Amino acid sequence: MKVAVLGAGAWGTALAGHLAARHDTLLWARDAALIAGLQARHENSRYLDGIALPDALRYDAELGAALAHGAADDALCVIAAPVAGLRTLCRAMRDAGCVPAHIVWVCKGFEADTHLLPHQVIAAELPEQLSNGVLSGPSFAREVGQGLPVALTVASVSAACRDRTLAAFHHGAMRIYTGDDVIGVEVGGAVKNVLAIATGIADGLGLGLNARAALITRGLAEMSRLGAALGGRTETFTGLTGLGDLILTATGDLSRNRTVGLQLAAGRSLNDILGALGHVAEGVRCAQAVLALARAQSIEMPITEAVCGVLFDGVAPRDAVSGLLRRDARAE
């Protein structure tokens, strides 16, 4: 199978390395210098340093070439750009006049200005593209790059997209499950990043494992309420792309969103934290969108509200936690 991966960040690079072990894979990035480095060293020293990439993996900075590769009859196109760049990439694909027949995206979050999920952005920009879906689940790019075991879910209303994605990714140490709840999978992948910031704050303040467990559990309830209101199925949120991804992102030391929370608890400013990370922390980008959607649906999301207070309103982390503890008692 031919596979084009659009986006050479940590996640796109790790997935491309996995795919290249079995398929004719081309990794694209618009940054010519990044591509030149990949071609010379077979390592993404900027985003996934220390991980050797397969010799068979090819690289290109020309979008047209990547799209042509991913538009072959037996091909798959993987969109690994962040949500913030998704609409621009879709427009570039449309302008290039070469939209692949089968597309799967791996980005997580809501578009900041519109509060749209990735599938809604793609439907608006590429309305003729009908075989598409989302690949998500509890996964750190570095571990995938190291070939460690991982389980992911592809969700699509298109059986052709599910089958093509399964055939591409399900090999080696990667196990793929299939489903059709695109909204539920996307909401889980977006909201868990915000909740991971909350658990990072609690851990950074030394509040203990009891507090962490409470935040994860009540955070899952927030995720489920919002996801169901937006059209997702409740059972999706107890699976890999909901609870599974939440546990990993809230507790794993490789989690950028958890790191943001830890550093906020240590008194660092958000700007300094993001500057030092050098990578996207989607929980920061989509926290306000999550809260706005919750309010539009009249859904209570106190943990998300507390995170937004710390990120954007100058609320001290300890005061935000105190506010959660002062909430009225209620039935679970």
Swiss-Prot record:
Is the keyword Cytoplasm in the record?
A: yes
What is the first-listed, main subcellular location in coarse terms? cytoplasm
Could you confirm whether the keyword Ligase appears in this record?
no
Give one Pfam family, short name only: NAD_Gly3P_dh_N
One annotated GO molecular function: NAD binding
Record HAMAP family? NAD_Glyc3P_dehydrog (MF_00394)
Q: Tell me the protein family, please.
A: Belongs to the NAD-dependent glycerol-3-phosphate dehydrogenase family.
Task: Provide the protein name.
Answer: Glycerol-3-phosphate dehydrogenase [NAD(P)+]
Gene source species? Burkholderia multivorans (strain ATCC 17616 / 249)
